[in-house]
Amino acid sequence: MKLLLLALFLSISASCLAEDITKISESRIPNEDAVPDYEAKWRLGAIQKLWNERRKMGHTPMTKFSPPGFPNADIFFKNETATATRTLKHRFAWALLLWAITEGKVTSKTSAVYDSTSGNTGSAEAYMCTLVNVPYYAVVADNLEKEKVKQIESFGGKIIKVPVALRNAKAKEFADKNHGFYMNQFGNAEKAEEFHESGDFYFESTNVYHEIIVQLKKDKEQIVKIPDYFVHSAGTGGTISSVGRYVARYGAPTKVVLSDSQYSLFYDYVIGHKFTNQSGAGIWTPPGIAGIGYGYDIEPVWYGETTSLTRNVIHEAMKMPDIASVATMRILDEKGYNVGPSTSLNFLVSLYKAYQNKARKSAIKHRLTIVTLACDPGDFYRSTYLNNEWVEKSFKKFGGVMGMECWKKLIQESIDTGSDFYSKGLTMCPGAFKV
């Protein structure tokens, strides 16, 4: 009897809760707006502003570096510091906000956009949100460089400081609490980043590899029109994945190489599919290389949630000692390249690819062409990576300034003569490299 009553109750409950289809009748023709007029008007206006920004962005310039020690190799920097916010994240934030508005994640009623950032995405998101009149809050580490804080604020962003490991969780918490939208650049980059060719279409693709191909094609002095290697690090993983997807989709003969920092988990995530069930707690060693790598987060590497790095479109991955990247930053600074530590890491991996191709007598017969990105300016790091006191304290385990100078000498020697800086550095320079 009890079971019969329970079944009757559940049946009645289900019928009460069941949704009914909208019916066509002589008194009603179903025809309503899915999006209110005022919202459609706001969305159209916001998207038009973003496309106007894309046109102003144009193509960031490319600069060729030809190391004397590798006479058959060219390393191109695509200079993303030429954007309005001076970083690679300008085009990325543009893509993120365009995605969020297009999908209705950000609307005219959104109280604010919140995101976790190490600085560069924050300044670019602040710029883009200000462009469409949506308030923006950057949730940053409590020890973020003062130069980056100033940069975010200069574009209209507000700063919320938290412990670095809590940035993602706190950004989501603040967004939920204040009826805002958590952009989650790490999880949503793969949804937002463009990876299609656009030809001469009026609304041109923002894919950085697309621009590279267009620029090399137009350069009459450039014989090699398609790069042999594209080298880049990963923060969200969005940029390098968008390039990898583009290369795979169109069958381009370019190898996509992930450059990773010393204690980052990305190398092992890509090569061995590790750390999908384990965080980097106890592995990550600060300061690392600003803006890139994975390890300080309290969560494992979860695709679509904590990262957008698409491992299946990466051809190679390579790690470099952090102190060597710092040394490279000093070399590039002295040569007039105003670039940050992630750019220096990219260059270092590019230089080693040139060495490998020379040492292995590669089958590549034409002039080896490597393209990497100049991600942000060295100006942001005058108080850190370009400051000897900070280097001495932060990289004490690797010899501090003395260790940096050791690597600097070997890397400069490689640029000049084509020698192997990596093997020499691991044996000759201070640090815990001996097994």
UniProtKB/Swiss-Prot annotation:
Transmembrane segments: none
Entry-listed glycosylation sites: 79, 277
Signal peptide: 1-18
Positions of post-translational N6-(pyridoxal phosphate)lysine modification: 89
Record keywords, A-Z: Glycoprotein, Pyridoxal phosphate, Signal
Family annotation (SUPFAM superfamilies): Tryptophan synthase beta subunit-like PLP-dependent enzymes (SSF53686)
GO CC annotation: cytoplasm
Chain residues that bind pyridoxal 5'-phosphate: 235-239, 342
One record GO biological process: cysteine biosynthetic process
Family: Belongs to the cysteine synthase/cystathionine beta-synthase family. Highly divergent.
Protein name, per record: Putative pyridoxal-phosphate dependent protein F13B12.4
